[in-house]
């Protein structure tokens, strides 16, 4: 039986970008499918999970939550993106110029996840970049971008990745991503 909207865990889910943990096929601890987090592959190094902000902590949406609330993974994804968009307002998301790049600031936790919001890149951030975007997301709370044709900006993104990666927490990617035709792809070496 589905829960009412007032008791729904899934309705509060926020899409959250996470690094894929290498899998050797042997689980460290056997866990029932219902107890595992809902995971949507983004690319070969990143995935989308769904978190519920419970003020004192963040809780992963698990497969059992989908079953209990009779919601599909695709519907969860739409809910998660909508709630991530709402976070840009409630967490005061803003773009801050920094040397040759633009930093996206939003109170920690969800900055890198903002690459999932097409509306930001197609409209809100368009005033900062004329061509294709280049973005670095080395950790969950770090997102910076520039025009992909601006070599000084690309170098600054590389420097940012190098600064964040060794000591970083909740690391995501050491790659620069290029947004072309509405999708993000790792920059070719």
Residue ranges, per PLM feature:
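Structural alpha-beta junctions
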Residues: 86-90, 127-131, 164-172
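Short, well-ordered loop/turn elements at secondary-structure boundaries
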Residues: 42-46, 54, 98-99, 128-132, ...
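Amphipathic protein-protein interaction modules
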Residues: 125-153
